[in-house]
UniProtKB/Swiss-Prot annotation:
One of its GO terms (molecular function) is ATP hydrolysis activity. This is ATP-dependent RNA helicase DDX3Y. A motif (Q motif) lies at residues 178-206. InterPro entries: DEAD/DEAH_box_helicase_dom (IPR011545), Helicase_ATP-bd (IPR014001), Helicase_C-like (IPR001650), P-loop_NTPase (IPR027417), RNA-helicase_DEAD-box_CS (IPR000629), RNA_helicase_DEAD_Q_motif (IPR014014). It comes from Pan troglodytes. GO terms for cellular component: cytosol; nucleus; P granule. It catalyses: ATP + H2O = ADP + phosphate + H(+). There is a cross-link at residue 213 (Glycyl lysine isopeptide (Lys-Gly) (interchain with G-Cter in SUMO2)). The modification Phosphoserine is found at residues 85, 89, 101, 129, 454, 592, 603. The modification N-acetylserine is found at residue 2. Residues 412-573 form the Helicase C-terminal domain.
Amino acid sequence: MSHVVVKNDPELDQQLANLDLNSEKQSGGASRASKGRYIPPHLRNREASKGFHDKDSSGWSCSKDKDAYNSFGSRDSRGKPGYFSERGSGSRGRFDDRGRSDYDGIGNRDRPGFGRFERNGHSRWCDKSDEDDWSKPLPPSERLEQELFSGGNTGINFEKYDDIPVEATGSNCPPHIENFGDIDMGEIIMGNIQLTRYTRPTPVQKHAIPIIKGKRDLMACAQTGSGKTAAFLLPILSQIYTDGPGEALKAVKENGRYGRRKQYPISLVLAPTRELAVQIYEEARKFSYRSRVRPCVVYGGADIGQQIRDLERGCHLLVATPGRLVDMMERGKIGLDFCKYLVLDEADRMLDMGFEPQIRRIVEQDTMPPKGVRHTMMFSATFPKEIQMLARDFLDEYIFLAVGRVGSTSENITQKVVWVEDLDKRSFLLDILGAAGTDSLTLVFVETKKGADSLEDFLYHEGYACTSIHGDRSQRDREEALHQFRSGKSPILVATAVAARGLDISNVRHVINFDLPSDIEEYVHRIGRTGRVGNLGLATSFFNEKNINITKDLLDLLVEAKQEVPSWLENMAYEHQYKGGSRGRSKSNRFSGGFGARDYRQSSGSSSSGFGASRGSSSRSGGGGYGNSRGFGGGGYGGFYNSDGYGGNYNSQGVDWWGN
């Protein structure tokens, strides 16, 4: 075989030249100056420069004067980390996340008003919109409004909360407000307050909102169900809307490309449990509706990869449990360099659960601004002296706020203690549930996980629609159980202490302590699940010889709350006190004076008219506390049930808690 070199003749060269893609003929009249540049087929009938002139770095057309929040149907700059599309200001074309389960049923939702973003990976820290005025509301969304604001009520005794005493100690305390309109919180916050149907602030909100708006540190003690969450979310979000993202925005942009950049939240809220963290996050969703603030939540027991992906889309307000937050910080996903607001909710519970090392790691041993630069708030139902002393390390010239009988219980809760042997508890429980009917939510507390499963099985086989939660359940199972309970599909929830703290389950009519806790503070938080925000509630506790260690504290608590005290409980408390005293450290002194917590900076012998007279002893003469209750609240359960049932008449016509 021979190899012949064939040279191109002039005719072949001419044919190849005629195939020039940049010739005048094929480019539709393009200028000769553009010769040498390849033009895609779909642009060959346009001007050579059209489609390339005003492009961003990703290659997609992007009008610079176009609002990133109002782009119906336009390409969404996929791959460009600093820009995202909103898919329209109305409902057309908006991504609907119904039926999708993120975070095992909670959290991470692609939602307008919360950082509208595509799931292709766009950052909430967008180049254009974040430089706009953060105080201006974004367009509304009817679907999102329905999702966020479709439940809840103010409670039949909400107006009575005005009688609750309040004491604030500290230098230069700002005056309290009477209505939300008394202080400027901006258009977005006021609009969301109307959507939540809040008619007037609760006592803790009246005092905490102006304190936080005045950029003062705060330690607040308030009874459960008093509106603590809104008390810190409203002023913090209001300040973020007013001040904008500040240096945090620049830090995120300079930190790296999408997928590797660290997020710098402006506000951090720490909570002891994942349930409470999710609850705070859902409240933050409400109050950040139609704003550019994007809340996020991270907690243990859920897919950390999904949480990281959610964080990478941007985070301005972060709600977290301490353990998972430390994990995120060590992974380089969260930086606290520009955190202006720190909130510790249920602070005593976090310390009881052993989170103090993680809290100190977060607050003192990382890059968080020091006290005096950041603004720190502590909220809890109880604040004993030990925790107040710890607060010296986190708070700077703080104001101590005591609202209601902190560490005690609300008089909206009727408490009943009955003697029940262990073998009789299940039959007693059936009697109670049979008298209650199926239209009210009942929360049953037990001490062990095995006991929760066993009792749920028993009630199920007795024909009751019930569910249960405890620490061994997966996050998905726990969320599903809470959803079934809240919706009324399973009106009976059996729970261990994991559900006792901070959960805001509205309309819980009855709390039953099937097993009493060994700690009186745990008892306070358990029964605080009912009677929330002015609603009337009922708490029944099964007592026997196993619970003798809390006899004295329980008696003091019932006396202070003007509840009916069984004679056998008084006798047991007397005998127990004079036969060697209470086993373990008595905590009854925490409830003296009506509030249960005092500012340790004040003299231990001082008193305040806001607290009422100190009880001093277990006398039932009515010292301390608040309200104008007569005797022990008018006898019985005030008509909750129409059955004689057990331990007294449930339909007593005596004087109610408010003297009616």
